[in-house]
Structure formats: C-alpha cells, structure tokens
A protein has these predicted regions:
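Hydrophobic N-terminal alpha-helices or hydrophobic patches in metabolic proteins across all domains
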Residues: 18-218
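Short, Lys/Arg-enriched N-terminal segments with co-localized hydrophobic residues
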Residues: 1-18
Length: 218
C-alpha cells in the first residue's frame, strides 16, 4: 500500500514537472514570436478573434438591455462568462487535437496562445513612437500614437501631458501586457495565458466608467 502511494506521488510530481517544462517551452516560443511579430491584425491571430468576439457580444448584450441598469449589470456578467467559455473551449480543443496528433504541433499551438497573451513588442513600439513624436515637437502625431497605450482622452493634451500619460500607461500596461501574462502562461501554459488576456481585453473594452459602460461594465 505504501509502495503504491509512493509511486503515485512520484508520477504526480513527474507529471507536474513535465507540464511545467512544457508550459515554459511554450512561453519561450510565444515570447519569441511576440518580439518578432508583435500583434498582427489578422484573423488567425487569437487576440484579433477575441477582440472581435468581445466587440460583437458587447454591442448585442448592451443594446438588448440599455434601458435597465440592473439588467445591464447582469448582461455584462453573462457576456464575460460566455466569452471566457468560448475561448476556453476553443483553446482546449486545439490543444487536445494538437497534442493528440503530434507533441510538436501541440507545443506550437500552445506557443501561439502564449504569443497572443503577450504584447511586449507592441507596448515598446507604441511608447517609442510617442517619445519620438514628442521630441520632434509633433503634438498631433504624439496625441494619435499615445492612444495605442492609453484609453484617456488625449485631444486636449500638450506635449508634457502626452509624455506623462505615456510613462504612466507603460507602467500600468507592463503588468497587464507582460508580467501577468508571463506569470499565468508559466504556470498554466497557453490556456492560462490566453484566458488572462481575454479578461484583460474585456476589462479594456467594457470596464471604463463612461456613461455607456457605467452599468454594463461593473
């Protein structure tokens, strides 16, 4: 009996170590793809699909209950759950089929998911673009570029305000676009990374305290 318990514990530990190594390998692949390609606006890129899904369900749910604040709050919760279930189901199906067919294919698909969870290159590129425009004294260009890293109204900002907003937004987004996705991807692999980024996308879409989302985004 003791031997069975020892063997079972050994197998569990070995399985966990294998899963952790696999997650780290997928994360390394995803990070390399992110630094190489950034966030392309193409249909096959998971983040693009998630944004389109959130935008479509957001409009549908919000318009259906726009005259009832309580119903809007419930609709926002329902939309979040539905999006997460869809993303989780698609991700799990792809991983199951991928690893079933070939370990390398499964690892590649998991790496794609980790890639979609990260936006390190996009953050670096966007912030660099703002700073170059600000140094050149091109206010309109700096205002336009800073919108890629912040959801604030930038139309009335001067150069100093644009630079300050960029620094603050980079500090905030470093956690959302780099540190947190790396953490969840390292522990739970591509599934953990892509689900975290899905929550982040939903929050960025409906979480603002504007008149439009004051109830729906709660």
């Amino acid at each position: 009996c003791c031997d069975i318990i020892i063997i079972s514990n050994y197998c569990l530990k070995k399985g966990y170590v294998y899963m952790l190594i696999n997650s780290l390998a997928a994360l390394a692949l995803g990070f390399a793809l992110d630094m190489l390609l950034g966030d392309p606006e193409v249909v096959v890129y998971p983040q693009y699909f998630i944004k389109k899904l959130v935008a479509k369900l957001d409009k549908s749910f919000r318009n259906s209950y726009k005259n009832n604040p309580e119903a809007q709050r419930m609709a926002g919760l329902m939309m979040t759950v539905i999006v997460l279930l869809i993303v989780a189901a698609v991700a799990l199906l792809l991983l199951f089929v991928g690893y079933k067919l070939n370990a390398a294919l499964g690892l590649f698909l998991e790496g794609i998911m980790c890639w979609s969870a990260l936006s390190v290159k996009s953050l670096k590129t966007a912030a660099g673009g703002v700073m170059r425009a600000a140094r050149a004294g091109n206010l309109s260009s700096a205002q336009r570029k800073v919108k890629k890293v912040t959801f604030r109204d930038t139309d009335d900002m001067n150069i100093d305000a644009v630079i300050k907003s960029t620094v603050e937004s980079v500090a905030e987004n470093t956690t959302d676009w780099a540190v947190a996705p790396i953490f969840w991807s390292a522990i739970f692999g591509g599934l953990g990374g892509i689900l975290y980024r899905t929550v982040n996308i939903i929050d960025n879409t409906v979480g603002s305290k504007t008149d439009t989302y004051i109830n729906f985004g709660k």
